[in-house]
């Protein structure tokens, strides 16, 4: 209540006769994002109450969008408020241009912005207000499993059996694009082969890479040879493969929790999400955490004529009731039950490998290695040698063989 009153007071002050302030925002609430409309509505409500103007540039959170945001920061063209990835290799390059929440709270104590430890950066500061706790898992069209008598993929053996049944029936077993957004597949197969300790290790030299990471990449090749993926997996898009799943032309899809919002109402009781099964049957870990949050940039903070307006916008967007509007998932039935069960497993969650990789290494792993390993043009050993040559997790002394591949 105290925070809400403080925010109302700021908005009232801003609404007094004065020159309108112009603010620039960038977010991932673009394209087909399920929260895009709610985000735009919140911006318009802020404009109506404050008299200020918000110029928003939202996009879809793919690799090109990430690169565009990072390029703008590098060029000194950062926005005033940003909704972006948090506590990851993606956020590291921009932190020096962000304002720690502790600094904002010190100047606006009644606003009491939440400082979540889960998003505490290496320097000890929290810069982002979190939204969208997430998980990654295996989405399953249970009606297709019933129709074809396939076992649910709750073990690796059942997964392979289901792949064989659906391939024989002419149904795509696992809908994925190996050329567009392959990171869910890569992360989940490495996890399937790893213990939580192995998965969460961050090697700084090639000989430190867990053997389970090699086995995880080999699982991609194994699934490819089993015919688990679409025939055009090497040259199709994620939009196309996701539509195959939604239209019940594919039995499974590995994806993030945000995928639930794109599923049609008629699938609420015929689609569930479950953990990717472990290849050795031992690990119960799942990939998850908090992926994104709202930031305030130093550019607007250091501008006395616009600081109050920007802080008010940050407070407005991150009010608890407004965060619920942005995080709303319109799902019901079996899908909602399974998604809630996955989201509740916070003790089992491990952070994605790619979140801690630098951009060049991440792109080499996901966009070069994954398709090449899948078809057999590159071995898992060659893959990790090429990735580690780019020091994905920080400084290293690369072995000559790895360095030569750079």
Predicted regions and their residues:
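C-terminal capping/gating helix-and-loop segments adjacent to ligand/active sites or protein-protein/ligand interfaces
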Residues: 121, 328-397, 401
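Extracytoplasmic/periplasmic substrate-recognition and gating elements
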Residues: 21, 44, 48-49, 147-148, ...
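A structural signal for short loop-to-beta-strand junctions that line the ligand-binding cleft
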Residues: 72, 80, 108-143, 172-173, ...
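Short, solvent-exposed loop/beta-turn-alpha elements that line the ligand-binding surface or hinge
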Residues: 102-112, 194-215, 265-266, 278-286
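Extracytoplasmic/periplasmic solute-binding protein
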Residues: 127-129, 136, 160-206, 221, ...
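Conserved N-terminal structural module of periplasmic/extracytoplasmic solute-binding proteins
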Residues: 18-90, 280-282, 382, 393-406
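Hinge/lid segment of periplasmic solute-binding proteins
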Residues: 85-136, 151, 160, 185-188, ...
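Glycine-centered hinge/linker elements that transmit conformational signals in sensory
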Residues: 163-165, 203-234
């Amino acid at each position: 209540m105290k925070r809400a009153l403080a925010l109302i007071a700021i908005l009232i002050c801003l609404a007094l006769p004065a020159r309108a302030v112009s603010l620039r925002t960038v977010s991932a609430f673009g394209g087909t994002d399920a929260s895009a409309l709610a985000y735009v509505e919140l911006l318009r409500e802020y404009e109506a109450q404050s008299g200020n103007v918000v110029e928003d540039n939202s996009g879809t959170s793919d690799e090109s969008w990430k690169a565009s945001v990072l390029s703008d920061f590098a060029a000194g063209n950062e926005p005033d408020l940003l909704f972006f990835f948090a506590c990851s290799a993606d956020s590291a390059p921009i932190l020096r241009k962000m304002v720690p929440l502790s600094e904002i709270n010190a100047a606006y104590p009644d606003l009491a912005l939440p400082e979540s430890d889960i998003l505490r950066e290496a320097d000890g500061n929290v810069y982002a207000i979190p939204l969208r706790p997430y998980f990654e898992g295996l989405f399953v069209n249970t009606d297709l499993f019933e129709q074809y008598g396939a076992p649910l993929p709750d073990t690796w053996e059942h997964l392979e059996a289901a792949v064989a049944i659906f391939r024989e029936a002419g149904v795509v077993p696992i809908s994925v694009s190996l050329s567009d957004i392959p990171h869910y597949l890569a992360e989940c197969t490495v996890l399937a082969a790893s213990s939580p300790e192995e998965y969460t290790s961050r090697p700084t030299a090639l000989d430190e890479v867990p053997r389970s990471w090699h086995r995880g990449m080999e699982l991609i090749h194994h699934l490819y040879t089993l015919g688990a993926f679409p025939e055009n997996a090497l040259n199709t898009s994620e939009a196309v493969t996701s539509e195959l799943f939604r239209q019940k032309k594919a039995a499974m899809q590995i994806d993030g929790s945000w995928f639930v919002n794109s599923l049609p109402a008629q699938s609420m009781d015929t689609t569930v999400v479950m953990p990717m099964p472990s290849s050795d049957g031992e690990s119960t870990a799942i990939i998850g955490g908090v992926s994104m949050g709202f930031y305030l940039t130093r550019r607007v903070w250091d501008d006395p004529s616009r600081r109050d307006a920007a802080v008010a916008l940050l407070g407005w967007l991150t009010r608890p009731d407004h965060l619920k509007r942005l995080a709303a998932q319109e799902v019901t039935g079996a899908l909602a039950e399974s998604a809630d069960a996955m989201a509740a497993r916070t003790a089992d969650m491990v952070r994605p490998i790619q979140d801690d990789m630098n951009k060049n290494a991440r792109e080499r792993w996901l966009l070069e290695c994954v398709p090449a390993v899948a078809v057999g043009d590159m071995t898992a050993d060659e893959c990790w040698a090429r990735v580690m040559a780019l020091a994905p997790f920080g400084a290293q002394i690369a072995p000559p063989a790895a360095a030569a591949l750079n």
